[in-house]
Amino acid sequence: MNTEGFPRDSETEMKHLTEMILKGDEEQAARSAEELSRERTEVNDLVDAISDAMNIVADLHEVDRYSVEQVERCEKAAERALTALRPKIRVEQTRISGRVMVASLKDDPHSFDKTLLMAMLEIGGFTPLDGGSDMSPQEIVQKVDELDPDILAVPLVTESAAKNLLETSHLISSNRIKPHIVAYGRGAASLSPQEGFGTVEEDSISALSRIAELLISKN
C-alpha cells in the first residue's frame, strides 16, 4: 500500500519493485514482489524485471555511482524479491540426469544471475552444483576438478568477466575434466561459440533450455 493508503496499479508496483531493488531495501522489494504476484499464475515477466533492475545496478557501478557495498545491498534485495516469486516461477519439469555447476567470475559486480539460474534449475528438477561466486579462472578449474560437472554455466555481466571466462576455457581445455561451458547474460554478447568454449545464451531462461538440450543429447 502506498503513502496515500490506496493500492498501486501493476505498472506503478513494477516501478516500485525496481526502485526498492535500486535502494537495496530487502523488505520492501519482497513485499512489492508478493503484491505483484498475488493475482498471477506465472511471474516470469517479474523475474525479468528483477534481472533488468540488477543490470541497472551494474551500470551504476561501472560509472562509479554505486559502491561495492551498495551493489551487495541491491543484490540481497533482488534475492529477497526472487524468493517471494519462487512458488510461481514456471519452468519445464525434467527428469534429465546430469551435473550442472554454476559459478560467477571475478570482475562482475554481482552474482544475481547465478542465483537465478540455480533457482530455475532446482525448480526444473535439476540439482545444481554451486561453483562459487567472484571466482578466478584458476579457482573455477579447481572447482571443476572437485565437482566433476557435465556442464559449467557461467553468468557474465561485464566484458572483463567475459575475458576471465576465455582464460578459464583455455585452462579447462588442457584439464582432465572438460565440461561443456554455457555462458549467458549481457556480458556474453562479446563472446562467440567459435572461440572454442561452448555455448553463448542471452539470459537465464535460454541458458536453462540449452542446458536441458545438452544433457538430453549426452544421455
Task: Tell me the role of every PLM-derived stretch.
Residues A183-N219:
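Peripheral docking tails and interdomain loops at the edges
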Residues E4, M20, A103-L105, T127-P128, ...:
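Short, contiguous strand/loop micro-motifs
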Residues E39, S67, P109-H110, A161:
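Alpha-helix N-cap/loop-to-helix initiation residues
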Residues M1-Q93:
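Long amphipathic alpha-helical segments
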Residues Q93-I96, N175:
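Short, flexible hinge/linker loops that cap or flank conserved catalytic cores
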Residues S32, K143-L147, R210-L214:
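CheY-like receiver
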Residues M120-E122, D130-Q194:
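Cofactor-cradling patches in redox/metallo enzymes
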Residues R95-G131:
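Glycine-rich active-site/cofactor-binding loop and its immediate structural neighborhood
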